[in-house]
């Protein structure tokens, strides 16, 4: 009895565990975590977005939101005929304008030739969930990518495969990543599922890793985040903080210092600023329209200062005017639906190409 008890206590701590239906579950040692620029050894959890050292460097809301796994994914290869997932989240909360599948679900894609194809979504059942994503596949090696929760954090996640199958960690993408810094929209509000935030759509479309530093209500061009994202050399930085900048004076105060911090370590990397998203409310709300115009004018003024001051590889992208939209891309006149995210991703890719920011 003592021997049996010791084996029982030890087994769950290993890199894999067996379920009752003859699937074997594998942990993070068997898949590549993508969408992060911070080494696991520097984080409280491998699925965090900020280093543990930043807990006392950023405001409390920023730290709390950084525990969400927005933009993160795991990638692996397996020849299983059935693919399952079980995961545990930190909070298990819900919102009245975003589906639980986007907040705390997981999205499965597989590499079909040269493109990533959606397969299924793991629907959350609470803090701990288990879901069969696909079954009855032929037994051949395939590459899979699983996008993690946007508005909750992953405490643990495991991939379940046939007991006779193998699983292999995918190789790291050799391309330089793209880094996004922004707001609740950057974080993924309010996609219906986790793979539909624009940063992940762009990642799949360009086959490039994308780091998502979206902080709901708190994307404010702050120096600690600028310092962190400057520690890597991406292909480009995309700054879409405007919805959280509160007032024009804050834009004037923080825009150029943000660029200077990035430039101190990455003197030539392109930095792209996105103006304020055009809410359909501004069609009729004259006060909001006036305030938004003042915000955009402040950002454009800082951009012009940099260009006149000799800054290079700084870009400014104006989002489509309201007259160019059918106004059907948001859930609440602010946050994007899947339709809005797809349109925004397509728009940004076209803009990046037009500016010559993407490798041919």
Model-inferred region functions:
Residues 6, 12-177, 353-360:
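N-terminal secretory targeting modules
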Residues 199-212, 304-305:
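Short helix-loop-beta junction
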Residues 277-360:
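Catalytic His-Asp segment of secreted/periplasmic serine-dependent ester chemistry enzymes
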Residues 181-183, 213-216, 240-243, 274-277, ...:
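Active-site-proximal beta-strand/loop segments in catalytic clefts of secreted hydrolases
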Residues 1-4:
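Positively charged n-region of N-terminal signal peptides that target proteins for export
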Residues 175-199:
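Catalytic nucleophile-elbow at a beta strand-turn-alpha helix junction centered on a G-D-S/GDSL motif
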Residues 194, 202, 219-256, 265, ...:
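Oxyanion-hole/transition-state-stabilizing segment in secreted/luminal serine hydrolases
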């Amino acid at each position: 009895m003592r021997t049996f008890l010791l084996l029982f206590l030890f087994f769950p701590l290993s890199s894999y565990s067996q379920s009752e239906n003859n699937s074997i579950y594998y942990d993070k040692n068997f898949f590549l975590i993508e969408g992060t620029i911070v080494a696991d050894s520097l984080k409280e959890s491998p699925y965090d977005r900020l280093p543990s050292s930043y807990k006392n460097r950023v405001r409390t809301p920023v730290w709390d939101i950084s525990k969400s796994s927005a933009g993160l994914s795991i990638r692996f290869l397996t020849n299983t005929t059935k693919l399952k997932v079980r995961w545990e989240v930190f909070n298990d909360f819900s919102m009245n304008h975003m589906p639980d599948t986007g907040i705390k679900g997981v999205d499965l894609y597989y590499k079909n030739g040269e493109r990533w194809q959606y397969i299924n979504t793991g629907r959350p059942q609470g803090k701990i969930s288990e879901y069969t994503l696909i079954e009855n596949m032929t037994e051949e090696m395939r590459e899979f990518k699983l996008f993690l929760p946007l508005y909750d954090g992953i405490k643990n996640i495991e991939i379940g495969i046939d007991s006779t199958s193998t699983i292999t960690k995918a190789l790291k993408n050799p391309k330089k990543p793209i880094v996004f810094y922004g707001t609740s929209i950057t974080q993924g509000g309010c996609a219906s599922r986790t793979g539909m935030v624009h940063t992940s759509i762009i990642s799949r479309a360009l086959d490039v890793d994308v780091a998502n530093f979206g902080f709901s209500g708190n994307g404010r061009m702050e120096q600690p985040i600028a310092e962190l994202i400057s520690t890597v050399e991406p292909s480009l930085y995309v700054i879409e903080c405007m919805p959280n900048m509160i007032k024009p004076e804050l834009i004037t105060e923080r825009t150029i210092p943000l660029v200077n911090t990035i430039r101190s370590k990455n003197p030539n990397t392109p930095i792209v600023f996105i103006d304020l998203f055009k809410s359909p409310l501004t069609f009729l709300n004259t006060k909001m329209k006036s305030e938004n115009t003042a915000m955009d004018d402040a950002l454009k003024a800082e951009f012009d200062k940099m260009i006149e001051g000799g800054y290079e590889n700084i870009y400014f992208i104006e989002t489509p005017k309201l007259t160019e939209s059918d106004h059907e891309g948001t859930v609440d006149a602010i946050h994007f639906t899947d339709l809005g995210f797809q349109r925004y991703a397509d728009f940004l890719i076209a803009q990046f190409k037009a500016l010559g920011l993407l490798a041919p």
